[in-house]
Structure formats: C-alpha cells, structure tokens
C-alpha cells in the first residue's frame, strides 16, 4: 500500500471538509464584538417595568407606563429609579423604592426576558467566523455574568458589569477591561448597543460603533447621539459587521 499517497488523499479530503464548512462564511477583519445587554441582546423591558411599578406601588407612588420605563433605562438601576420616582433622589422614600426594586427584580428578572429574535443565530455565525464576543453592561457585575452564562452559554468569552473599581458607561472603563481580557486592540473591536449611552461609550473607548434600532431608543435618538451605522435586524447587523 502506498502510505504517502493515502496520507495525501486523507489531507485533501480533510481540506475539502473544512472548505465545505467554511463555504458562505465571509472573512472578517473584526476580531471582537462587545455587546450591550438590555435592549441589544436581551429584551428585558417587561420585567424592568414590572419591577419598577412594584417598587413604586410599595411606596404609594404613581406607576409608570412601559414607554416611560423604556426612556428611563440605560444608565443602571440607580438612574432608572431616579427617573421613575417623583422628585427622584430628593424624595424621602427614594431609598425604599430602590431597595424594593432590587428585591422584586432579583426574584422576577427572568419572568419575560428573552433574547431578541435572530440574536442567537447571529452570535453563532460570528463565533463560527472566529470572532470573540463579550458583554458590557451597567447592570451589577454578578448579574451580568449570570445572565451571560444562562442565556448565552458557551458564546461569550467575557462578561463585564458595574463594579465599584470602574466607572460605568459611558465611561470607557468596562469596554477597555473586556478588550484587555480578550487580548484585542481598538482597531479590531466593534461595540454594539441600542442607546445614546452606548454610542458615547464606543466613542469614549475609541472603537467602532454599530447601533441597533430594535431596542429601547429610536433611530432619531441614535442619530442625534452621533451613530452613523444603525441596524434594524440582527441579519442586517451581521452584514454590517462583515463589511467593516
């Protein structure tokens, strides 16, 4: 038996299999994509609104509509409750409302929360291209890590949340920390989010920004913040990332 010939045949067959698997996967220059969480990967609005209103009701305060809560989110729980509570932090019951929100959301944060349609498929296609993926959120750090693990198992290399050692978004600290952990440069990184805060975060971090309009902010809000790349669907975002 000609073993040299057999080895060459096996290698050619292996190469054919690899080529077939890679067929249709466009080469990407982007090495890492960092994602905002709420309104970008996960639709958390219904649970956030329910917990906000449970906290307000517990303090005898008027409740908020889901559209109001949509406008309030994006800067962490403190800002959400500051905007939802009448007179904000000046209200003597603010801390009680804040604590009530934390307790309710801790027990009900996953009642209705789900990934947006098409997100999982998009993440899997990016992973297949060798792109590193990370989450950066203003949610508390341990919650971000739990949500990353539970909703996106095996997909995220890094998950970074709010921590006393770092400034929260729109400061670049969390994005830069995620980049450090992944070992990528600014030129290799894209940040994706659904809000004006995310657009500013990407600008402050010195990375390319792709905004999405399926989340908590309008297209006009994103444009006003300076977004020049806005995707309406995960499929459109994938094509946008491939073109960079």
Task: Annotate each PLM feature.
Residues 190-231:
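Acidic, Mg2+-coordinating phosphoryl-transfer loop and its flanking beta/alpha structural elements
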Residues 2, 15-17, 24:
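Short, positively charged and aromatic/hydrophobic N-terminal segments
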Residues 152-159, 222-241:
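Structural recognition of alpha->loop->beta junctions
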Residues 74-107, 117, 124-125:
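A metal-dependent, Asp-based hydrolase signature
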Residues 28-71:
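Active-site neighborhood of HAD-like aspartate-dependent phosphohydrolases
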Residues 57-59, 63, 80-88, 112, ...:
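Substrate-recognition/cap helix-loop segment adjacent to the acidic, metal-dependent catalytic center
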């Amino acid at each position: 038996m000609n073993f040299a010939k057999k080895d060459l045949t096996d290698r050619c067959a292996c190469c054919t299999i690899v080529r077939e698997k890679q067929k249709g996967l466009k080469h990407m220059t982007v090495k890492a994509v960092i994602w905002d969480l709420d309104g970008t990967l996960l639709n958390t609005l219904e649970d956030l609104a329910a917990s906000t209103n449970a906290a307000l009701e517990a303090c005898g305060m008027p409740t908020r509509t889901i559209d109001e809560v949509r406008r309030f989110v994006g800067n962490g729980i403190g800002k959400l409750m500051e905007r939802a509570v009448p007179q904000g932090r000046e209200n003597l019951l603010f801390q009680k409302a804040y604590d009530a929100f934390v307790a309710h959301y801790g027990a009900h944060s996953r009642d209705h929360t789900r990934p947006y349609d098409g997100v999982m498929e998009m993440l899997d296609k990016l992973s297949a291209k060798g792109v590193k993926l990370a989450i950066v959120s203003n949610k508390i750090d341990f919650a971000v890590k739990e949500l990353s693990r539970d909703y996106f198992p095996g997909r995220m290399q890094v998950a970074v949340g709010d921590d006393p050692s770092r400034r929260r978004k729109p400061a670049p600290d969390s994005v830069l920390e995620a980049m450090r952990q992944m070992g990528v440069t600014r030129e290799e990184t894209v940040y994706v989010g659904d809000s004006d805060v995310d657009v500013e975060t990407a600008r402050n971090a010195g990375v390319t920004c792709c905004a999405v309009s399926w989340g908590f902010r309008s297209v006009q809000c994103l444009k006003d913040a300076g977004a020049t790349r806005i995707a309406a669907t995960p499929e459109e975002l994938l094509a946008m990332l491939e073109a960079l």
